[in-house]
């Protein structure tokens, strides 16, 4: 692992806003078509000027993803993409200077261990985690681990979410 890291994605978004621009955030499924190819694609996107990259971690039951991401997820899992590959990709991309977030279902984080995941992810320079299936009401353990490791946490909401839930 290297020591030079990209700033967090929130910093990059703030920098874009200060320029009067919208932040450009690219999405890549890690491990598709291969882990190294996804890393090369991420570096190319960084070189082309994206403000941040969101890496999608493949999950065996990607019910909240669309068909294209589902197909990429299946292909990545069939090729053996594992959580260590995610940390490798984040390490490579943050060392290349790009702020890197991860989108993952909650089950892989629990399987790895919440505190261990947060520490390992922060150790390779990750910015934060987007957890589409972890409601904020159930996120206390993740919030504590993320805060302890300086990670951003992003919950998703539906258009029908009441204002009190978004506060």
Please give the residue ranges for each predicted region.
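Mobile beta-alpha loop/short-helix "lid" or hinge segments that flank ligand
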Residues: 59-62, 107, 140
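Active-site mouth loops of central-metabolism enzymes
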Residues: 24-40, 100-113, 153-160
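N-terminal positively charged helical leader segments and presequences
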Residues: 10, 14-17, 35, 43-48
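N-terminal amphipathic alpha-helix/helix-capping segment at the start of soluble metabolic enzymes
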Residues: 1-27, 90-92
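Catalytic beta/alpha-barrel core
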Residues: 77-81, 125-138, 151-162, 166-167
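N-terminal glycine-rich anion-binding loops that anchor highly charged ligand groups
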Residues: 16-23, 48-63
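Active-site beta->alpha loop and helix N-cap motifs at the rims of alpha/beta catalytic domains
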Residues: 4-7, 41, 46, 52, ...
């Amino acid at each position: 692992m290297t020591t030079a890291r990209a700033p967090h994605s929130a910093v990059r978004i703030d920098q874009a806003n200060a320029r009067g621009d919208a932040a450009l955030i690219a999405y890549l499924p890690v491990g598709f078509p291969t882990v190294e190819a996804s890393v090369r694609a991420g570096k190319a996107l960084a070189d082309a000027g994206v403000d941040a990259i969101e890496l999608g971690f493949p999950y065996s039951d990607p019910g909240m993803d669309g068909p294209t991401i589902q197909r990429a997820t299946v292909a990545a899992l069939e090729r053996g993409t594992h959580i260590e590959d995610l940390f490798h990709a984040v390490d490579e991309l943050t060392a290349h200077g790009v702020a890197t977030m991860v989108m993952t279902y909650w089950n892989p984080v629990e399987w790895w261990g919440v505190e261990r995941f947060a520490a390992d992810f922060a150790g390779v320079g990750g910015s934060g985690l987007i957890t589409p299936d972890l409601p904020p009401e159930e996120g206390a353990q993740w919030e504590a681990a993320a805060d302890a490791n300086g990670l951003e946490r992003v919950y998703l909401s539906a258009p029908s979410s009441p204002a009190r839930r978004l506060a």
